[in-house]
Structure formats: structure tokens, C-alpha cells
Amino acid sequence: SVGFKAGVKDYKLTYYTPDYETKDTDILAAFRMSPQPGVPAEEAGAAVAAESSTGTWTTVWTDGLTSLDRYKGRCYQIEPVAGEENQYIAYVAYPLDLFEEGSVTNMFTSIVGNVFGFKALRALRLEDLRIPPAYVKTFQGPPHGIQVERDKLNKYGRPLLGCTIKPKLGLSAKNYGRAVYECLRGGLDFTKDDENVNSQPFMRWRDRFLFCAEAIYKAQAETGEIKGHYLNATAGTCEEMMKRAVFARELGVPIVMHDYLTGGFTANTSLAHYCRDNGLLLHIHRAMHAVIDRQKNHGIHFRVLAKALRMSGGDHIHSGTVVGKLEGERDITLGFVDLLRDDFIEKDRSRGIFFTQDWVSLPGVLPVASGGIHVWHMPALTEIFGDDSVLQFGGGTLGHPWGNAPGAVANRVALEACVQARNEGRDLASEGNAIIREASKWSPELAAACEVWKEIKFEFPAMDTL
């Protein structure tokens, strides 16, 4: 008889393998799945494994031409989610050979491709990925990483300070450059193009690059510190994006910027390679992330997007504030902040980390805290994020009653006061307000900032809970 038997058979017969021992080279995924009523968890988990690897809805003749055992994804464990009805965490192991080397794009096309539209599931969310060292090693990763960046900037022992230039749309290039200069002159390390500033009719990219470069050099000369402005190279085509990055390099500026989700992983990886070859730092903005990661039971958790960015390449990435106006629950945020910075991260379910991740020697990424933060948040930010971070105050700099430069001074004084207090062994969590008040006695700029923002809070419950 012929070995081929046509017809539809249950996924779980082939793809649910509870006895499977995961290999060190497997990519492991944790999915939060909500099956349709009446679909057993094992069948749903097996369906996820099948549809994101070798399976299709019916047996096909060509299955006989390959070795399914070698190439199939396997659902090897299923656990119910506490407190949720009919929701499970399904663990899936993928053989390494299913993925193209050095391609985040291909990895995502497989793991989070068609399977998310699968009818037997009401919802599906990718909670975490374990990237094996064998696969990590096929990626260049961040152009420079944390240590090289500090050496380039000659700034040690404290978080870096930034500011997004507002209003985000509508300024002319010359006025934009002026705002950049004032912020850098006041004491910030970086200023930033807003993520939606690309090359619009009111300010074409080349004009902006030129005026910002002038601002950087003038501020450097006057302060004796290295300064940078994240020049947004994001564009409608990869070629245009590269053209902008090349122009930035010709101006001799230290850093460019990219919106990695709207620009796409392929473009981002190309830009990251260019940045390493040409000594440019790369700042990454995560515009569009909340579309993908904010729903609790469908989509992709940001920790996965953060891991993907570390593989694709970026030296800074926005990662929530814990205290400002945007999403972020403390333990979970710190979980993916560590995934960005550290070489080795232990599995820790209380922080949402489903797998131990070994990055081997892939450089780290600086997390950027940005969004609704001001001087009163400085002690908490210094405490939560530590030295290896970038703290960005947009409105918290430009909204200062006396102008941009005094706003920058206020932030820098607050930061230096917090770092000094921490180094003296004081507890920033309990003494934070006192530390800021004390510092404001000898800094009128800080005193004015303290007055303006003394009552501002963004108190809503976080959605990103376990």
C-alpha cells in the first residue's frame, strides 16, 4: 500500500509532544492562547505549533519528501493561566533550521505569521521567545552597545539626558535648530527628532540636518561636552533612508535615529549595519508598538519586540517610564529593560520572563525613558533605571517657564543631585523629594521647574500586568 493517506487529521497527533526534551538550539516560544469554546487546549496548542512551522490543514503528498520529525514545531507544554477562564500558556519549540540566519524578518514571518488569524483560536499573544546562542550569533546586533557609546561620548557614571524637540510638527528648520542648540547648551546630552519628523513640506530633511549639526557644534564648543541630536533617517524607501544616514555621517554628527516598527526590520537591520561600519550610534523609536503589544490577550508582548530589536540592531530604544504618561508596570518593564542591557537573564515569571536568555556577546541596548516625565520624577527614574539609561524630557524641558536652556539646566541639576545623593548612600525612593528641594535652593532654574510641575501626575492603572 502507498504510504500516503489523504484526509484531515487532528494536529495534536503530530504536533503535541509533551515528552519532548527541548534542544539548546531550539527557538522556544511562549504563547498565551484563548481557544474557541469546545476546542481542547492540546489541539489548540498543536495547531499553533503546526501553523507557525510545517503544518497545513490537510495531509499533503509532499510530506513524504521531507522529514517532519526534523522540521516540525512542537507544542511541548501547556499550562492554564491562573485567574483566566479557558486561557493557556502554550510552549512551542522550533528547530533552528526553520529560520534564515540573521533575519528577524524571517523569524517573525514564521512565528507570528498566519497563525494569528487562525479560526480555532479566539485570541493569541506571543509572550516571550528564547533565542538560542546558535541563532544569536548570526546577528550583528546593536551597532555599538552601551560601553562603546560611553567611550564615544566620554560620559560615565550617570544616566544620559535627552529631550524631544516640540512642537513635533510645524517648526522651520532654523527655529528647530535653535531649539536644539538651547537644550544642548543648557546641559542635555542629546536632543531628538520626534518620530513623525521625516521630511515634510515645512521642513525638509536636509535643511534640518544642517541646522541641527550647526547647533551641535556650537553647543559642544561652548560646553566642552560631546553633544548629539537624533537625526531621524526614517524614510519611505530603504534607499532614501540610507541617503539620509550617509549625509549625517558626512556632517560628522554622532547619532541617527530610526522608527523600527513602521520602517520595518529589514530596513532597520540594513541601517544598523551601516551605522556600525561608519561609527554612527543608532537611536530607535518604537512608534506603532502599542498597536501590537497593548492588548493583554492578543498580539506580541513588547519584551519580544525588544529582543527582536537587540538582534536587528539599535543602541537606544524607548521602553516606557514606569512613572510618566505612557504604559509600563514596574517589574515587567524592568524585566525587558534587563533583557535589553544584560548578557544573561534568568527566567523569572514574576517579571514576565518565561525563559532564561543568554545573549552571549551581543552588545546591549540603552533603554530610553520618555513620555510625561519631569524633574520630580528624577529620583524615581535614577533609582529604577540606574546609570545605563537615557532619560528624555520633552515637555519637561521645553515647557519650562523661562525657556529651553533653563529647562535643560533644571533637568541636569536634578540628575546630578540624584546621582550624587545615590553615591552618598541616600535612599532615593524615600528621600527623593527632599533631594530635589535641596538642590533647587541653589538652582533658580530647578526651583522654577519644581513649581510648575509640582502637582502633575498621570495616575491610571497599568494594563501590562501578569
UniProtKB/Swiss-Prot annotation:
Keywords: Calvin cycle, Carbon dioxide fixation, Chloroplast, Disulfide bond, Lyase, Magnesium, Metal-binding, Methylation, Monooxygenase, Oxidoreductase, Photorespiration, Photosynthesis, Plastid. Signal peptide: none annotated. One of its GO terms (molecular function) is ribulose-bisphosphate carboxylase activity. The keyword Plastid applies. It comes from the Eukaryota. Mg(2+) binds at K192, D194, E195. The disulfide bond which can form in the large chain dimeric partners within the hexadecamer appears to be associated with oxidative stress and protein turnover. RuBisCO catalyzes two reactions: the carboxylation of D-ribulose 1,5-bisphosphate, the primary event in carbon dioxide fixation, as well as the oxidative fragmentation of the pentose substrate in the photorespiration process. Both reactions occur simultaneously and in competition at the same active site. The basic functional RuBisCO is composed of a large chain homodimer in a 'head-to-tail' conformation. In form I RuBisCO this homodimer is arranged in a barrel-like tetramer with the small subunits forming a tetrameric 'cap' on each end of the 'barrel'. This is Ribulose bisphosphate carboxylase large chain.
